[in-house]
């Protein structure tokens, strides 16, 4: 496992995002430029009806994407199942499925949806809202799709960490690797023969990357 200290990832990525005011067409969707349309709130996003689409909000800007591909879905499901089985067996907390929205910022609003999320038991509310979660998960898992842009992925990781996520896993099924990002700014690159470790966020959890492919 190759580790290095990366204390500036959050600031660098958020600075990139703050100056990214031009429209960004992608194969999956379209991010309108600032000023091209009025900013949307989390409440408006929740009421939006776009069947068979994946939506997020980035500082008030709507992102609309098509569903992920088969490999993306299979890897996300495989890892999510393993996380849920471990969390339930050890009464560690709650696991959330793909596309569960978490409101990370307000005025303008940011709503992100990871492929898998975990929240420690002591942080799970007695009554969960029907709308977006108003808190950040402890673990956020992102499974890269073939059209994910590196700069957009970096910005998303930075937003997770800034919001209080303690551990982020970014799984690349094409390269058969995973990157681990921690709240202290450190990160690690794992090869296909290495193992994801839940560390102190998901104690006792270990998943060989090779089992996901």
Task: Mark where each language-model region is.
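Catalytic toxin/effector domains delivered as secreted proteins or via bacterial secretion systems
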Residues: 1
